[in-house]
Amino acid sequence: MMFPWKQLILLSFIGCLGGELLLQGPVFIKEPSNSIFPVGSEDKKITLHCEARGNPSPHYRWQLNGSDIDMSMEHRYKLNGGNLVVINPNRNWDTGTYQCFATNSLGTIVSREAKLQFAYLENFKTKMRSTVSVREGQGVVLLCGPPPHSGELSYAWIFNEYPSFVEEDSRRFVSQETGHLYISKVEPSDVGNYTCVVTSMVTNARVLGSPTPLVLRSDGVMGEYEPKIEVQFPETLPAAKGSTVKLECFALGNPIPQINWRRSDGLPFSSKIKLRKFSGVLEIPNFQQEDAGSYECIAENSRGKNVARGRLTYYAKPHWVQLIKDVEIAVEDSLYWECRASGKPKPSYRWLKNGAALVLEERTQIENGALTISNLSVTDSGMFQCIAENKHGLVYSSAELKVVASAPDFSKNPMKKLVQVQVGSLVSLDCKPRASPRALSSWKKGDVSVQEHERISLLNDGGLKIANVTKADAGTYTCMAENQFGKANGTTHLVVTEPTRITLAPSNMDVSVGESVILPCQVQHDPLLDIIFTWYFNGALADFKKDGSHFEKVGGSSSGDLMIRNIQLKHSGKYVCMVQTGVDSVSSAADLIVRGSPGPPENVKVDEITDTTAQLSWKEGKDNHSPVISYSIQARTPFSVGWQTVTTVPEVIDGKTHTATVVELNPWVEYEFRVVASNKIGGGEPSLPSEKVRTEEAVPEVPPSEVNGGGGSRSELVITWDPVPEELQNGEGFGYVVAFRPLGVTTWIQTVVTSPDTPRYVFRNESIVPYSPYEVKVGVYNNKGEGPFSPVTTVFSAEEEPTVAPSQVSANSLSSSEIEVSWNTIPWKLSNGHLLGYEVRYWNGGGKEESSSKMKVAGNETSARLRGLKSNLAYYTAVRAYNSAGAGPFSATVNVTTKKTPPSQPPGNVVWNATDTKVLLNWEQVKAMENESEVTGYKVFYRTSSQNNVQVLNTNKTSAELVLPIKEDYIIEVKATTDGGDGTSSEQIRIPRITSMDARGSTSAISNVHPMSSYMPIVLFLIVYVLW
């Protein structure tokens, strides 16, 4: 036993090593694993991994087969961190079991065992194999005899030459246990050379044996014989938990035996079991305890059967059920550490301390894997490992034991400075200093020791319990803690207050959606205490942020009233006001019932359907605390715009009725229905839609609309209509009956149009008179029968082009660029339809008729004016009528010559003289050229400068008098007139507003005044035109 002062010195030394960092023993992060190194690998080294964490950082060493590896002596070994690197591995020196040791100042741990093996495959000996001679029908076994090797192998056989491998089937089998080739019944095609191919599953190296010749004997064919099992599994085969077990079975025989499997106990195979290689292999993946037992292979042919039996035994490596964990425990206390593992056979246990076997003594005992150490000392600290093992493996569990010794210390677990309780309550004052071993405690109130009595008692953990607290118990309490390493004190101040009471509690209320309400919660409390109001809604804390638009706390310091605005159905439920102080808490609850419009009805069904009715039933939904008064039904079809309220029987559905018949439905239409409930609050949410149903078929009732027609080609009667919408077709097989007859005839001609979307029908017959009237009607039908016809309407047959030309065609020259063509209309009976107008064709004498220009006039016009023509040139023209079918023949051609062009010389030397009411104009006479029209007169165009309306004065003289109020500026032009049109305009004259009694001007110099050599007032009778 170490003296207390020595233990304290040791603890202080360890604390200095750690500084402020927390000391920690080694803990493995990576441990080495079993490895197989391929002999001859290009990689010239192998690494066994080992890494541990700890503070201080661990250092490492390794053992091979239980002996330390001396890194300074063995140049082939190298440490890289904690990893062991083996350079140029050698199977003679390096094969074995490796373990890693990680050590720091707190102890040592040992890794799991890792086996290093070397995989190799040597060559077959070059030795000729003897010829195998058998009879036809006899079975044979060709031996492989693999060369020396290490590591798992796979086998195959070559027949004669590579790459012709033997294909396994019910007659031929290659054992992956022995490598031998088995042929149950030899056939002539089997004669040849057989070579065993052995492949390493680790290195992929492949070697070939010497060929074995197989020949047939000449002394006859082997007769039939019963099966002889040549490939069978061991009588007892251990199988590991979770492994894949493969049992081989193959027999020789004639005829070829059939292989079957079964369990000896008669239990069926589990679904995971697979039969492979034509039942020659039974495979059990993920082997478990229930897969253990006896298995039988039955080989059978017509000559008999043979059975091979074997037992699979289950084993499991140790697996931890309970690991050990780090423990920190006080000196002189006792340690009980239990580790438990499962496995078969049952594991045994041993313990290590700091990497070495734990030495048992009087204080240290191991029983059933559990470690007990009594009267702990600091020197018991270290790294411990529990090892569970059976013959199939072992597992390690590591943990650190820290044995601590310290004087009482309140710094890590200080006492509460203030404890508040209410009168009459029970209070416990804690006193739990950190101390190893645990400290003994005593108490003082002020300077007086606290003695135990019926209300005051000392707790086992050192705390003080006071029952039925009074005001006199208030004060300062000191806990004095002591062990063999020292003592310490802690203080708590106890405050005793009056209890909190709710003076105005919330009460049950009944409200409607949209209203607002206040739930009161007012209290009386000790003035020394702060108070907190908390509201709970249906057991959850009321969320004033998320539901801030509805919830708000109102009231003063002693009030926590809850206002709920614009109440919704979701606010219905239980409300609890929780009042908390630092000492106590009280609460009061109230139920709030919110009445709202009904919830959606449920389970809407269509119980019966006809062509125009549907009988519905439903179940009542939530009434939301207000009884349902009535129901309404809505329907929707693929053709409707949203949901529509429908007519029902009864017309008004009261709240106690849960069935109704919908009427006035369209036949053969797919409907959905939903139900809406209403109460005093209003209409609720609609139910979910019913399943889609289709009404029954019926005879159609609605004929097509907009029956009309006309147009088309020669000898056609075109009849058109608007198709009947699908929702009004009332059934399948819908179509149209088109009936027509010439006006005045009694017998109808009928035809059927089978497409419901067709909008027209064309009747063709050479006897149809163009543009003749027909009476037309269109009916409907479907598979149920014929429906009504539309009202009779008149439709005209197709037109033909007119057959006669217009008469009395004449042409008149209007100017140098215009002529007017006129004619008489053609008779209506000869128009062969509705006359649309006339087409005028014209060309000049120098052109060709084929390149003539054309102009159309609509309706019954009997003249046309042709513009943009060339002057003084002969033009030819003809006219024909046209309708929608085309144009008729042209009239006889007439000709006319356009007039000469107007003079190109404008009126010159225009002068003016103005008074306050008159303007006198003079200009020089315009003389026409030989190729121009003779001047017949003049036109004077005048307007105010602020307007666009032009007025015209016609005169046959070279002067004119304008009576004008000269109140603003005037713009004046002069043109010569001829039969060929108006000549070129003079320059514009601007006559300014008169400010003096007399003003003069001319086109040559408008700003100068030109005296006239002679002046004669001329009184003119004027004709004024407004030019556009």
From Swiss-Prot:
Tissue note = In brain, it is expressed in frontal lobe, occipital lobe, cerebellum and amygdala.
Propiece residue ranges: 1003-1028
| Compartment(s) | Cell membrane
Question: Which residues belong to the signal peptide in this entry?
Answer: 1-19
Any one of the GO BP annotations:
cell adhesion
Q: Which residues form the Ig-like C2-type domain?
A: 26-117, 122-208, 227-313, 318-402, 408-497, 499-593
Q: Which CDD domains match?
A: FN3 (cd00063)
What pairs make up the disulfide bonds?
50-100, 144-196, 249-297, 339-386, 431-479, 521-577
Which Pfam families does the record match to this protein?
A: fn3, I-set, Ig_3
- Cite the positions of GPI-anchor amidated serine lipidation: 1002
Start and end residues of each Fibronectin type-III domain: 600-698, 703-800, 805-901, 902-998
**Glycan-modified residues:** 65, 193, 375, 468, 489, 765, 860, 895, 913, 931, 956
Answer yes or no on keyword Nucleus: no
Q: How does the entry describe its membrane topology?
A: Lipid-anchor; GPI-anchor
GO cellular component entries: extracellular region; neuron projection; plasma membrane; side of membrane
Alphabetical UniProt keywords: Cell adhesion, Cell membrane, Disulfide bond, Glycoprotein, GPI-anchor, Immunoglobulin domain, Lipoprotein, Membrane, Repeat, Signal
Q: Which InterPro entries match?
A: FN3_dom, FN3_sf, Ig-like_dom, Ig-like_dom_sf, Ig-like_fold, Ig_I-set, Ig_sub, Ig_sub2
**Which portions of the sequence form the region Disordered?**
684-713
Sum up the protein's function in the record's words: Contactins mediate cell surface interactions during nervous system development. Has some neurite outgrowth-promoting activity.
Q: What is stated as this protein's family in its record?
A: Belongs to the immunoglobulin superfamily. Contactin family.
Quaternary structure, per UniProt, is:
Interacts with PTPRG.
What is the name listed in the Swiss-Prot or TrEMBL entry for this protein? Answer: Contactin-3
- State the species of origin: Homo sapiens (Human)
Taxonomic lineage of the native organism:
Eukaryota, Metazoa, Chordata, Craniata, Vertebrata
